[in-house]
A protein has these predicted regions:
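Active-site beta-loop-alpha junctions enriched in small/polar residues
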Residues: 11, 59-63, 148-151, 174, ...
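Glycoside hydrolase catalytic-domain groove-lining segments
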Residues: 108, 117-132, 136-220, 236-240
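Ligand-binding grooves and catalytic loops that recognize ribose/phosphate and carbohydrate rings
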Residues: 15-47, 187-188, 209-248
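Aromatic-rich peripheral "rim/lid" segments of glycoside hydrolase catalytic domains that contact
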Residues: 73-85, 254-306
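Short, solvent-exposed loop/turn and secondary-structure capping segments
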Residues: 66-72, 181-182, 208-210, 263-264
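Substrate-binding cleft of secreted/luminal carbohydrate-active enzymes
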Residues: 53-54, 60, 199-201, 218-272
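Short, small-residue-biased leader/transition segments that mark boundaries at the very start
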Residues: 2-7
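Polysaccharide-binding and catalytic clefts of secreted carbohydrate-active enzymes
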Residues: 27, 50-140, 145-157
Length: 306
């Protein structure tokens, strides 16, 4: 079992506008540290002494980095922080201090390195604060990272900050038929001595249906294959590549059962259907791989030294 803690706007006294500002500006609000302290104290008490509880995810898919730094709401952007209104002056002043400390005269001369250094500082501040708070109340369970998603998981500064403070780096892994070799090689370097976990992945199949009507399968990040057997083949191939890296400690298939989106359209994410009927052709492939994990680990260990 794992538990997730999140950056929310409950400590602000007003609703935060995700469509105007990057959520990570909330890190610098005067009440944030107190809010996190109360939240961790409350959640950690639920699992005190629980030997079956693995640990905590700090959050889910935080907006550390966006594709090609194109969206300041989905990725930390120095200019975005510098332009924040008075309501978020603490985050703006943090960015202004960064500019002064690095001798950057104006936004017009901000370099790519400046941008990445600032992203790394914000990520470091986040992970240092949150992990220290967790350890204040819970020293027995693991801190499982923040389920990095999209371009955040490909960013060196972000991954390194996570690995510096968390017990492992967790990534939600979509939009690929199999793990990319260059990304896995980067993770081995960026994570250092820390392992990584694939905290979310799945694939959907076109043959899923409810009472004779095929699923819409339009919701979610997982791609689409033809059959449940193909889902099983995807699962085996994906997980074999993870085992081959030798620094992946596991994966979490998302999710247990099929479900509906907000418009009532079904999506084939589960290992069982909406009616809780198991997808046997998918599960047989999953079972075959899962029961072979330890022998496969031995195989890849031996192969790595040959």
């Amino acid at each position: 079992r794992q538990r997730q803690m999140c950056i929310r706007d409950r400590n602000l006294g007003y609703a935060f506008d995700d469509d105007k500002y990057n959520r990570l500006v909330l890190l610098f609000e005067p009440t944030f540290a107190t809010y996190i302290d109360r939240l961790v104290q409350e959640k950690s008490a639920l699992f005190a002494g629980d030997r079956h509880f693995i640990g905590f995810y700090l959050d889910n898919e935080l907006p550390f980095a966006s594709y090609q730094n194109a969206d300041p709401l989905r990725g930390i952007d120095l200019k975005h922080f510098l332009s924040l209104p008075e309501r978020y002056k603490a985050a703006r002043e943090y960015a202004e201090k960064f500019m002064r400390d690095n001798g950057i005269a104006s936004t017009g001369v901000i370099t790519k390195k400046n941008q990445e250094d600032f992203r790394g500082m914000v990520a470091d501040y986040y992970y240092q604060l949150t992990t220290a708070t967790v350890r204040r109340y819970d020293k027995a369970h693991l801190i499982l990272g923040t389920r990095l998603h999209d371009w955040s998981k490909y960013n060196q500064k972000v991954v390194e900050a996570c690995a510096r403070y968390c017990d492992l780096v967790s990534v939600n892994y979509y939009a690929r038929w199999q793990p990319e070799a260059d990304f896995l090689a980067n993770l081995k370097v960026w994570c250092g001595a820390k392992p990584f976990l694939v905290s979310e992945f799945y694939i959907k199949a076109e043959d899923a249906s409810y009472q004779g009507t095929g699923y819409a399968n339009t919701e979610g990040g997982g791609w689409l294959v033809h059959t449940q057997k193909n889902r099983g083949e995807f699962y085996q191939n994906f997980c074999l590549r993870l085992l081959e890296t030798r620094n992946c400690v596991g994966w979490v298939h998302f999710e247990y059962n099929d479900g509906y989106d907000s418009n009532g359209k079904a999506s084939n994410k589960g290992v069982v259907s909406i009616e809780y009927e198991p997808y046997e052709s998918f599960l047989s492939h999953m079972r075959q791989l899962n029961l072979s994990v330890h022998s496969l680990i031995d195989y890849y260990d031996i192969k790595s030294v040959q």
